[in-house]
């Protein structure tokens, strides 16, 4: 609706402009039709203009208008409560992020036309003004008035039709808005629709055009008003100018009104088009809502199907109730028979013995039930803690592997950038070599020019001596003019062919120079290019091998998850078998009751008990049977809950399997682009080997855990909260895997860009080599036989000319010596002569005094670090350690050089030196623990949480018993040889274990010792 209001505001602005223009035409019409008498009277008396709208002029006024426009999108968070699927778990709160448009108020300058008092007039009706202004306007003819009125009438009709269209459009929009309000309203869109911004932009440009047009019109109106108000006495000239201006104004006004009509029509069409698009979007939304309703109905059907298991559970419970009621009835019958028999018999000794036997049986049965309940609770708690530890450990390992891969990718990208910088440096060196060659060619040109200049100077100096030879040469030239002309034509032909040959030779030299620049002066770069091509082929082989490794890893991963799924199905079967075991327990109980019934029937003739004791025993038996029935119901309810939990676990594992298959598909897509990322795969190979070893260890640990879980899950009862936590953790892992896939995609895009650039460079090199080979073959194919003969003839003729010139220069042109001339004047002083040789070396001088101390020298470079081997380890206990023996700290925080073995709990010294060891052992509350720190199976230190205790006879007889502590701490420095072992043995007590470690064992190498030092 906001967009509709924007369109309406633009249409109203256009119509207001049209109305103002119409008002201008009215005003011009009324001011032009003035009576001749009135104008004549005004001219004679010097009074003001008399007309209907006298002293009024049209002005263009700008106004600032506020409008609401879109200013981006903002986000907000909304909580959503999701109910549990099977109705027994707590509500889950999900926070979703939504987007909504943000609007702002903007201001826009709009130009409008208003009627105001003309220049020199004021007052309410613009009647106050100077009396000196004369009206020199002439009344137009009737034909001109009629043509103007026809045009104005046409414009008014067009404006009225536009107003009708606007009113109809407003009615339609109002009706549509009412319909949408009845059908549920139309929510505000989250963002602007794709065509709205372009439409608004086009409307804005049209409004700017109209604004410029109104300004031009304003200027023309001001000129007209000035002419109207301040007219001079030249009436004919003013009439002609006024007529032309009037025609131009009317023509321009008509053109602009047509433009405004067309713009209004286009605006109306765009609004109708937008309205049609909105209707189509609403239909699509309705279809989407119907699809969502169908999906919702399907989910409801699934839920109703899943509730069928509850109906079966109700049937089973009702059957158990019937059985219990039948047993109660049989018990009542037996009690009645016992009462009858006891009334008939009077013997009481045997009755008491049977009563004691029955009580013993019942106590034994109660003790057995309590023991089984206690064992199941302990096993459930133990499996819960072990599952938590396993999931947290797996998540930590996945996180570390992801972070390591990200670091490796960053390092590889940095190496690629360094290689690109080296390539740029290599190209700059080639550019510098080209610049040096250009400088050398410039030097050669300058040398040639200087030689030519020197030749001209020498020839000019001997010009007087060679006049005779020149004359003789001229005679020879005249005599041989025809031969010279023929020779000239031949030379021209040879020069033309020589120029073409020279151009080819120059091109060939440029190509050869380019080849030299690429391959080097002696072919060293060519060898490098060959080695690069070989490396590319080798890298492609590495890519193929790594492709095989990735395929193997994917197969191993899919096999492991299939195995895990099969084991979970086996666990589910075991749970179903547990239900049968419970039914067997119930049948055993019924057998026990049957045996009791037989024994009671045997003893009916022998037992006689008092009625009070018998009633008490009967009440106890009733309570026991009720308790057994309740226990059976609770056990069956818990078993059904366990079944539902395992079904949900199977569903989540199926979802995880699908996500892993999707990730496998993504990996195959990455493998298809292996030609583009060959620069990174050489380092990924090592990482994949490491990851393969780690994954094998993880799968081994998973298999061991599954074996433990299979042995202990027979009587397990999983808690609801633990499952929720595990599911949330698994969802976090999936989210992290999604982020990892996104990071891999971005890295793949960047690498593909780099590799595509390198491939373009290789393609350019190949194209240049191909072009060079073509030019070389073209040069080899050129026939040079005729050119060679012509060049030989030319060289022979030039040699003959040179011989004649040499003979001419060798002639002696000197005449006889002349008379001696007069003595010349004394010359000026000459320059000083050269320096003479060095004299003998003098004796050595005395030793001078000691000078002041010099300045402090600069700081030298830092020295190398001492070669201190780094060795440390730290491990914690997260598994139960109930029995005595070597404590196996299974959770490793750090283990440099793999000196600590987490499977045996033993540290082996790899080098000789001094070592520091620290251990913190935490036991259960008020339970004494005792441990020994051993070096190579020899006790070094002993720890007792209860403190020192005297042995044997030294122990006092009467002493107060204090609550023992549950903490033992070791801090010790030991000299170890290479191969010595350190471990901690538990003597008595039981250590505490938790996900957050309570028992920790750490050690480190202080310094290494050599043999000569000891």
Swiss-Prot record:
Which residue numbers delimit the EMI domain?
Answer: 53-128
Q: Can you list the GO cellular component terms from the UniProt entry?
A: extracellular region
What main location does UniProt list? secreted
What effect does gene inactivation have here?
Answer: Morphants at 48 hpf display body curvature defects, impaired brain development, and motor neuron defects with abnormal development of axons and decreased arborization. Morphant embryos and larvae have decreased locomotor activity compared to wild-type.
Q: Which SUPFAM superfamilies does the entry mention?
A: TNF-like
Extract the Gene3D superfamilies matched here.
2.60.120.40
Q: Where is this region: Disordered?
A: 125-150, 811-869
Ranges of biased composition (kind: Low complexity): 840-856
Arranged from A to Z, the UniProt key words for this protein are: Coiled coil, Disulfide bond, Extracellular matrix, Secreted, Signal
Q: Name one GO biological process term.
A: axon arborization
Please state every residue range assigned to the domain named Collagen-like.
Answer: 815-865
Q: List localization entries.
A: Secreted, Extracellular space, Extracellular matrix
Main role?
May be responsible for anchoring smooth muscle cells to elastic fibers, and may be involved not only in the formation of the elastic fiber, but also in the processes that regulate vessel assembly. Has cell adhesive capacity.
The protein depicted here goes by the name EMILIN-1-A
Naturally occurring in which organism (per UniProt)? Danio rerio
């Amino acid at each position: 609706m906001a967009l509709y209001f924007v369109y309406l505001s633009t249409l109203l602005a256009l119509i207001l402009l049209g109305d103002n223009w119409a008002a201008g035409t009215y005003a011009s019409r009324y001011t032009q039709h003035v009576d001749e008498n009135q104008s004549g009277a005004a001219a004679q008396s010097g009074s003001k203009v008399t007309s209907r709208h006298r002293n009024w002029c049209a002005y263009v006024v700008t106004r600032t208008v506020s409008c609401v426009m879109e200013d981006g999108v903002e986000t907000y968070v909304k909580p959503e409560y999701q109910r549990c699927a099977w109705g027994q778990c707590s509500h889950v709160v999900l926070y979703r992020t939504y987007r909504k448009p943000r609007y702002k108020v903007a201001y826009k300058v709009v130009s409008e036309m208003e009627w105001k008092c003309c220049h020199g007039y004021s007052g309410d009706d613009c009647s106050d003004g100077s009396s000196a202004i004369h009206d020199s306007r002439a009344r137009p003819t009737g034909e001109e008035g009629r043509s103007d009125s026809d045009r104005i009438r046409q414009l008014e009709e067009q404006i009225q039709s536009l107003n009708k269209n606007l009113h109809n459009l407003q009615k339609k929009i109002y009706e549509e808005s009412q319909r949408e309000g009845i059908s549920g309203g139309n929510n505000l869109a989250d963002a602007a629709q794709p065509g709205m911004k372009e439409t608004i932009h086009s409307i804005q440009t049209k409004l700017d055009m109209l604004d410029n047009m109104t300004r031009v019109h304003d200027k023309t109106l001001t000129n007209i008003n000035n002419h109207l108000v301040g007219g001079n006495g030249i009436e004919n000239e003013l009439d002609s100018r006024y007529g032309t201006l009037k025609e131009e104004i009317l023509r321009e006004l008509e053109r602009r009104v047509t433009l405004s009509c067309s713009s209004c029509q286009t605006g109306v069409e765009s609004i109708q088009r937008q309205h049609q698009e909105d209707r189509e979007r609403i239909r699509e939304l309705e279809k989407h809502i119907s699809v969502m309703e169908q999906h919702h109905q399907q989910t409801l059907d699934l839920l109703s199907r899943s509730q069928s298991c509850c109906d079966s559970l109700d049937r089973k419970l009702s059957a158990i109730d019937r059985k219990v009621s039948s047993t109660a009835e049989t018990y009542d019958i037996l009690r009645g028979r016992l009462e009858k028999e006891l009334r008939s018999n009077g013997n009481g000794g045997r009755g008491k013995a049977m009563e004691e036997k029955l009580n013993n049986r019942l106590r034994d049965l109660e003790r057995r039930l309590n023991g089984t309940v206690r064992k199941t609770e302990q096993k459930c708690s133990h499996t819960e803690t072990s599952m938590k530890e396993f999931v947290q450990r797996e998540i930590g390992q996945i996180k570390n592997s992801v972070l390591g891969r990200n670091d490796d990718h960053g390092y590889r990208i940095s190496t690629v950038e360094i290689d690109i910088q080296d390539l740029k440096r290599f190209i700059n060196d080639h550019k510098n070599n080209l610049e040096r060659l250009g400088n050398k060619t410039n030097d050669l040109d300058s040398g040639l020019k200087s030689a030519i200049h020197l030749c001209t100077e020498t020839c000019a100096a001997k010009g007087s001596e060679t006049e005779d030879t020149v004359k003789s040469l001229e005679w020879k030239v005249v005599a041989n003019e025809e031969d010279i002309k023929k020779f000239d034509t031949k030379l021209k032909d040879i020069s033309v062919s020589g120029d073409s040959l020279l151009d080819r030779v120059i091109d060939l030299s440029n190509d050869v120079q380019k080849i030299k620049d690429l391959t080097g002066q002696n072919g060293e770069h060519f060898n490098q290019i060959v080695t690069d091509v070989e490396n590319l082929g080798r890298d492609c082989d590495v890519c193929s091998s790594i492709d095989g490794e990735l395929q193997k890893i994917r197969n191993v991963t899919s096999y492991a998850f299939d195995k895990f799924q099969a084991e979970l199905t086996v666990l589910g079967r075991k749970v179903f078998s547990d239900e049968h075991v419970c039914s067997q327990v119930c049948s055993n109980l019924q057998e026990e009751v049957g045996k009791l019934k037989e024994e009671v029937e045997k003893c009916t003739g022998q037992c006689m008990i008092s009625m009070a004791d018998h009633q008490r025993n009967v009440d106890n038996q009733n309570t026991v049977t009720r308790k057994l029935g309740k226990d059976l119901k609770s056990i069956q309810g818990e078993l059904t809950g366990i079944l539902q939990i395992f079904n949900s676990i199977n569903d989540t594992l199926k979802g995880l399997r699908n996500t892993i298959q999707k990730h496998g598909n993504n990996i195959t897509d990455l493998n298809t682009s292996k030609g583009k990322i060959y620069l990174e795969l050489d380092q990924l190979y090592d990482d994949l080997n490491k990851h393969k070893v780690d994954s094998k260890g993880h799968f081994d640990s998973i298999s061991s855990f599954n074996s433990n879980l299979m042995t202990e899950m027979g009587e397990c009862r999983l808690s609801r909260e633990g499952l929720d936590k595990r599911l949330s953790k698994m969802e976090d892992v999936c989210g992290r895997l999604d982020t990892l896939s996104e990071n891999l995609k971005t890295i793949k895009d960047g690498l593909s860009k780099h590799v595509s650039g390198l491939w373009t460079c290789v393609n350019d090199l190949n194209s240049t080599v191909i072009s060079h080979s073509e030019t070389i073959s073209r040069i080899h194919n050129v026939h040079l036989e005729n050119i060679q003969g012509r060049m030989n003839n030319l060289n022979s003729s030039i040699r003959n000319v040179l011989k004649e010139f040499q003979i001419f220069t060798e002639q002696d042109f000197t005449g006889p010596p002349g008379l001696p001339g007069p003595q010349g004047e004394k010359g000026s002083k000459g320059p000083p002569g050269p320096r003479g040789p060095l004299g003998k070396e003098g004796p050595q001088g005395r030793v001078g005094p000691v000078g002041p101390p010099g300045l402090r020298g600069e700081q030298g470079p830092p020295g190398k670090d001492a070669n201190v081997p780094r060795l440390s380890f730290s491990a914690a206990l997260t598994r139960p350690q109930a029995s005595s023996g070597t404590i196996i700290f299974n959770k490793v925080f750090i283990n440099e050089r793999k000196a600590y073995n987490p499977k045996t709990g033993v540290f082996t010294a790899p080098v000789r030196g001094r070592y520091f060891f620290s251990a913190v052992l935490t036991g259960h509350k008020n339970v004494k623990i005792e441990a020994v720190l051993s070096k190579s199976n020899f006790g070094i230190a002993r720890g007792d949480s209860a403190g020192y205790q005297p042995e044997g006879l030294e122990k006092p007889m009467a002493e107060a018993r204090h609550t023992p502590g549950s903490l033992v701490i070791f801090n010790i420095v030991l000299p170890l040889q290479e191969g010595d072992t350190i471990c901690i043995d538990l003597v008595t007590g039981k250590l505490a274990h938790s996900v957050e470690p309570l028992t920790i064992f750490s050690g480190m190498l202080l310094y290494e010792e050599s043999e000569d030092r000891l």
